[in-house]
């Protein structure tokens, strides 16, 4: 565990001490080495499932894929941010930018590997600070302050009941260790209080996912964030909600059986509603942000149904969606750098100008609509099957949701790549090797996971 944490911390002095000329290459290489070293976590041979144990941190088959995804994203964020956001900024601000990204990765590693629920809660909250600074300081438009406020208050309002609920659990059990939490009993409360306690436990994670209804902060935050902010938000920060739900639901039995139904229905209804919103979007980043809400709705359904297939499908879909949506944000950013517009009508027909980028757009769009045999489809099918097994009425919602997903993914591809090239963007800068490498490092892991899906199966 320390072989990842210490180099991650040392990346901050590296960013501040590296010469100006070598700042980005040095930090990129350093973070890439950390990402490669993190792959050793996949080799989990222990019988209990827990490995790399020390009193505060451990990895198990649920947290390992998410930890590796967090480490994998830092070099990609540095690669994506190099020329555009930072070339015209003072050198100290560039160093600060890299330090923020590094601190975010450090907090995420601590969150995903925490063995104590309170430590997880603290890290869950602390990730808010670097993300908020990224959005409000490096965002594009003045609306970034509004987006930052939404992000802050939604997250805080959802998280405070969780702290109270965890302290209540600590009071009745004497411990909040994840290793013993599975075998503990929920606090003995009156029926009404128990229901409020259950909602308090789950609300913070539903806001973070986000569940349809408490999702308003997400499109704002995504649209206003710089490219690195959008990538880490879509790929890893939303997954904190799913991970926390999987961890805490184990202790909430038997309350979940009776209280989870409205949330499952709301999540599946959200898949259809946010998909329909995507069909009417004109802003490219906003479309990708709403598609995240749609996919996370399926994940919420898969987790709340609490079957082994549901959990496995949710984890697979979280990992696959993390790589896919991050790739889509990078592609949207390459368009934005050239056309200086996120409006799809003003940047059409880019296949004529950037044909190789169109190939990447095509693969990423197909991954988003869950083409077989990609992990996206595997995750969605497992969730849909476990929901259908619970109630066959859900097939109407999930089937329609998947149909709409295919519709808006193709709409996004056709609107950006096909059609006549507008007259105001005739002279475009050609695509760079850096951009192709960036997208390849998103999509290659996704394609290679087809060959060994048990790496992201989780517990089952």
From Swiss-Prot:
TM stretches of this protein: 22-42, 61-81, 97-114, 118-140, 149-169, 196-216, 226-246, 259-279, 286-305, 309-331, 352-372, 395-415, 437-457
Subcellular location, principal: mitochondrion
Pfam families hit by this protein: Oxidored_q5_N, Proton_antipo_M
Gene Ontology molecular-function annotations: NADH dehydrogenase (ubiquinone) activity; ubiquinone binding
Protein family according to the UniProt entry: Belongs to the complex I subunit 4 family.
Matches recorded under PANTHER family: NADH-UBIQUINONE OXIDOREDUCTASE CHAIN 4
Protein name: NADH-ubiquinone oxidoreductase chain 4
Source organism: Tetraodon nigroviridis
